[in-house]
Amino acid sequence: MKVKVLLFASLREVVGSSQSAVELEPGASVEDVWTRMISLYPRLAPHTGTIAFALNSAFTNPHEALHDGDEVAFLPPVSGG
């Protein structure tokens, strides 16, 4: 199945784009997308444990199952004053 990936802020800078797509086996989870992205872009690894996950525009947990055509977003922590 194919999943669209959205990346924001520092994650976008690491990948060099705000969007990507990955092919995964049926039954894959949001966490599997993150693992695949790390295999493609190893500099994402330090962000593990600090990012928020969204599935089809709603925050979710990393174990949520995916379906073909889903949109997964990875969001780093927001800071500022």
Regions found by a protein language model. Name each.
Residues 1-80:
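Ubiquitin-like/PB1-type beta-grasp interaction modules and other compact soluble beta-rich domains
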